[in-house]
Amino acid sequence: MDLFEYQARDMFEAHGVPVLAGIVAYTPEEAKAAAEKIGGVTVVKAQVKVGGRGKAGGVKVAKSADEALEHSTNILGMDIKGHTVNKVMIAQGADIAEEYYFSVLLDRANRNYLAMCSVEGGMEIEQLAVERPEALAKIAIDPAVGIDQAKADEIVAAAGFAEELRGKVADVILKLWDVFKKEDATLVEVNPLVKTGAGDIVALDGKVSLDENAEFRHAKHAQLEDKDAADPLEAKAKAQDLNYVKLDGEVGIIGNGAGLVMSTLDVVAYAGENHGNVKPANFLDIGGGASAEVMAAGLDVILGDEQVKSVFVNVFGGITACDAVAKGIVGALAELGHTANKPLVVRLDGNNVEEGRRILNEANHPLVTLAATMDEGADKAAELANAAK
């Protein structure tokens, strides 16, 4: 789960990371009141979970509360890369002397953590990594040890901080590691981390991604979820405990097991090249149980996506036998009734497959087409989706 900047700022503050004052506002009037409370120069910052806010006009300096009112009026409701701005943060203005960069993230490829640090912050880190990779220090972090004082000292030295700054920056890095570890984050990023005119090190902007698999350890994290910003279909699937991710294609996908579903996405994308370049519309893993209720919930979510033109159900019977899956499909179609109005291609294999196919053949539902193989099913689903475009 990605946090808004103001949520990351509050989390930083709770762990002792030095930050400046910041107040979230949902209306121009609230923004003006926040600017008056903070006093002096403030910055009106659009709160969206996407980069490029400044270039899009979503970050403005306000020299007075009236200017904060004016800027927030213009920013609220703005569209930034498909994200509507529903709130702004009024942040205390900073006297910036230098800008730096720091992040720590889960490095899945190497099965550990990775810290990245640079004395050249404030710009797109991807651009810096490409144009001047030597300016970005990358330090592997042993998960069993984490970032201790010695590792923090190593990071600031590798990044090239001046000797007199290393102690201060290392202290902030230790606190940011505390956020990463204790909040079960997969990413903690500060860009920029700044030195003020007074010589203080302050986290001026923050990005935090939390591991949703660790939510059971953090009851308070549920309060951080922005229901309004969530995709409605993903929110609906989550409410029904379905593993669903919305994509941009036309072929709805249902499978059992993440590996099989990911393989199905690839096969459908390949088949789509011969049928109008249609693509998968989603990832949906119904897991080991394929009861009528689970299948109905999955189909209900997928058929609620207006982009979907056909559905490919690809199931390998294991613990859950194919006859149970077939009964689930028939029951789901009966339960959904007229809302099930798009063609389904079903491929079954594995445990009790013949009985499963018999059940579907006897049901003889007009929307259901049986496929013998995954390739055949993907091709048929892509063909049907293209015909309905």
Curated annotation (Swiss-Prot):
Annotated catalysed reactions:
succinate + ATP + CoA = succinyl-CoA + ADP + phosphate; GTP + succinate + CoA = succinyl-CoA + GDP + phosphate
Which PROSITE patterns does the UniProt entry name for this protein? Answer: ATP_GRASP, SUCCINYL_COA_LIG_3
- GO molecular-function term, one example from the UniProt record: magnesium ion binding
Q: Which residue range or ranges hold the ATP-grasp domain?
A: 9-236
Give the EC number: 6.2.1.5
Root EC class: ligase
Q: How is the cofactor bound?
A: Binds 1 Mg(2+) ion per subunit.
Q: Which InterPro entries match?
A: ATP-grasp, ATP-grasp_succ-CoA_synth-type, ATP_grasp_subdomain_1, Succ-CoA_synthase_bsu_CS, SUCC_ACL_C, Succ_CoA_ligase-like_bsu, Succinyl-CoA_synth-like
Q: Which residues bind substrate?
A: 256, 318-320
Q: In which residues is ATP bound? A: 45, 52-54, 94, 99
* Positions that bind Mg(2+): 191, 205
Entry-linked HAMAP family = Succ_CoA_beta (MF_00558)
Q: Member of which family?
A: Belongs to the succinate/malate CoA ligase beta subunit family.
Which NCBIfam families does the annotation name? Answer: PRK00696.1, sucCoAbeta
**What's the protein called, per UniProt?**
Succinate--CoA ligase [ADP-forming] subunit beta
